[in-house]
Amino acid sequence: MAKIKSVIGFEVDSNEIRAVEISRSSGTYSILACGKIPLQEGIIEEGFIRDADRFNIALTELMQNGGFRATDVVVGVNNENVVMRYATFPKVADDKLRNMVLLQAQEFIPIPVQEMEIDYVVAGDGVNEDEQPVTNVMLVAARRNMIEQYINVLSASKLQVVDVNATVLSLCSGLQSSVVGDEKYAVLNLTEDLVNFIVIKGNEISMVRSIQIPERIEGSVKRLFAGKEEADDIEQIGTVLGQETSSSVSYYAMQNQSSPIEKIFLLTTLNKNAQLVNGITEIFANIPVTVPDYYTANKFGLDQQVINEFAGCIGLAIQALEVK
């Protein structure tokens, strides 16, 4: 990717588009534009744009009313068309690792690799049961036709897609840069489409799990993200998140008895996180669950709640601007 001066971090899910334009000068990041726009039901389904015309109308309105000027865009995706898997490979020279990962990726990904764009993040080195050196990676695979669709639709609106990344990884990067220290922590990320559970220490990822929203709370989650929640929706969602957290932590503990999780961060774009934490801790109280504040050293002149809501977009843009 060529070096760029400003870029738009861009997220799409079933109910809205979010975008942040960021510039970098002398190592300092500045937010030039920030905004979101709701999407009508049916425009996005199963991670795909089903109605490109209505999508472009909403996108154009967001870009114009939000004062966006950059044309370079980094798209963040986190839906059922993105697969993340923790995998271990024999230790090889750095220049040979990518070929090995691509050749063996099918063993870990439940979708034909011919249909996927595959990338990976090195999660650290170790040894296997036979004391042989290994490299741990997190595989990230996204359906090629979904990526191509976003590139084509955004190009029709005169936007240039310079990269496509997993949004949850940009959120994790933001935590590492501004929130966490040396502790081992877990990220519990709730979107309208998925729940992610990722265990991290420093730059090393040691577990990743993604599940679709359970059918029994689909309606509650949709209403909550639309701002139309009913009286017991938050309680029901919190209960399920608590159960999923308990299951994930138990599985991790069985595999890593000597390295326990010390803290869990709940991530959403909602303003109901405190209530969700209460629901989670009613079910699972073994490890502290908190809601992080992102980029507190530089609030970019915006309210902290806004920074937290757009943390994924901010992280996507910052990562692109860091590329030399």
Task: Name each model feature, range by range.
Residues M1-K324:
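Hydrophobic/aromatic-enriched cytosolic interaction surfaces used to assemble or bind macromolecules
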